Amino acid sequence: MFAGLVVGAAGPAWADTPTMDGSYTETATLPSGGTLTSSWTVNSCGDGCVFIKAGAGGSQARLVDGQWVLDTLNNISCADGSYTQYGASSHMTWDPTTLTGTAQHTYIVPACGRPPGYTETDQIKIEQTPSTSATPTPTPTPTS
């Protein structure tokens, strides 16, 4: 999976690559034109690594060849209301500067009338959510 480095070899220039930290909203535009959004909480897990928590799950994204890469399992929700937990594998890649990329989903079980192996590619855009930890403004106390 990872090759070892030769002693004395220069490492990747992590300092030149934008990192992610904080709260984000990921918007996926489906091939049909519809959109889905999810909230992410992102924390660094070392050079070229971020841990992304989305909903009840979480996974590490790694910087590979100048792109963030995240491989995970996803749930499938069908138009008829049926639901398959962890029914698709997802391979997401996005540019660390523009925070745009793709998410390719491959069904690993039949769902929504589609066979295993069915793939769909969404366009994704990730935006940092403004911090809500601003200093609260005092509320005036009414006088009698």
Set out the residue ranges of the language-model regions.
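Secretory targeting and sorting signals
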Residues: 1-15
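Predominantly extracellular/secreted and cell-surface proteins with exposed
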Residues: 30-94
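Edge beta-strand at a domain terminus
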Residues: 105-144
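Tryptophan-anchored aromatic micro-motifs
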Residues: 16-38, 101-104
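Residues that flank catalytic or metal-binding motifs in active/ligand-binding sites
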Residues: 20, 38, 88, 120-122
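A short, structured loop/turn motif at beta-sheet edges
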Residues: 16-21, 44-48, 62-66, 91-100, ...
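Low-complexity intrinsically disordered segments
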Residues: 88-99, 104-107, 113-117
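A short, terminal or domain-edge coil/loop segment
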Residues: 73-75, 79-81, 100-109
